[in-house]
Each structure stands twice: as C-alpha cells, then as structure tokens.
C-alpha cells in the first residue's frame, strides 16, 4: 500500500480507537445526552461522523451518502465502525479516487472532521458527569486492521488526574 494511504488507514484506526475511548464506560443513557438546543447528542454526533466518512467514500464510489437515523445508539456506533472498514478497504485496495479528490483533501476534510467529533464525544462525557480518563495516546495500541468497536485497553493510562471525579481510582 502506498505511503499516503497507509497513513490514512492508520488515521482511521486512530479514529476508531479515540471514538471508543470516548464511549467506553459511558453511562447507559449517554447516547441521548442533551446539553442544549443546537448541540448534537452523542448519537447524533456518531451519525454525523458516519455521514462525513460516507461522504469521503463517495469519492471512491460516486453517488451520495445520507445515513438514516437508526433505532439505537449502539446501532449508530456499529454503522460508524462499518464505514471505517469500508473506507479502509478502498485505501488498501488502491481504489482510484474520483476526479478532483486527493488523499490530502480526504485528510483535511472528512477525516479531520470526524476526528474533531471524536473529541466532542469526549467533551460531552465530561459534561454528562462521566469524564474520560486520560492516557498517553503516543503509545496506544492502534492497529490499522482494528477498526471495529472492540479496541485495545489503554496501554499507558495516566496515574495522575487532577480533574478526576472524587470516586475515580487508577
């Protein structure tokens, strides 16, 4: 696989990891957590992440992608990970990008957009009263073939967490 595509594939794996990091251990009702009008719920964010990645996929296959609302947050999460797998397959296969699209534009557009929303999920966890424990992502066990919801446990969780909830233990 060409170098740029390897990097994009790794980026998708990092996106899978960071998204699951933000979702792992979330309260049961987190998908419907509502901060205020005009702010997406976690379920809406995951659907939007799938949408922007589906848009990226149209630059391989053509057409449009507009995901329907699914019944559960878990289904939204599963569809998101399926979309990561579909995109990664196009990258691995060396599929041609449609005219006017490049690997750099995929990164600066939909891929980066989706990563931004993974960070928003982590922020919503804090606002929901269930913050995400910190870790050193440089040493995270991120594998390009691991794009599903079953992600590795933190390789280097932080032992010190000044903003930790009172009941947190490392």
Residue ranges of predicted features:
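Short, contiguous alpha-helical
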Residues: 5, 9-23, 28-68, 100-162, ...
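Helix-adjacent hinge/juxtasegments
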Residues: 58-97
């Amino acid at each position: 696989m060409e170098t740029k595509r390897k990097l994009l594939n790794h980026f998708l794996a990092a996106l899978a990891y960071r998204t699951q990091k933000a979702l792992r251990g979330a309260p049961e009702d987190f998908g419907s957590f509502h901060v205020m009008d005009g702010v997406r719920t976690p379920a809406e964010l995951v659907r939007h992440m799938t949408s922007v990645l589906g848009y990226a996929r149209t630059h391989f296959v053509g057409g449009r992608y507009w995901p329907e609302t699914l019944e559960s947050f878990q289904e939204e999460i599963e569809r998101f990970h399926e979309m990561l797998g579909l995109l990664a397959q196009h990258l691995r296969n060396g599929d041609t990008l449609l005219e006017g699209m490049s690997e750099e534009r995929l990164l600066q557009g939909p891929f980066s957009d989706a990563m931004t929303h993974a960070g928003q999920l982590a922020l919503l966890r804090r606002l929901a009263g269930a913050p995400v424990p910190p870790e050193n992502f440089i040493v995270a066990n991120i594998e390009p073939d691991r794009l599903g919801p079953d992600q590795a446990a933190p390789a280097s969780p932080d032992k010190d967490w000044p903003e930790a909830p009172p009941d947190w233990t490392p």
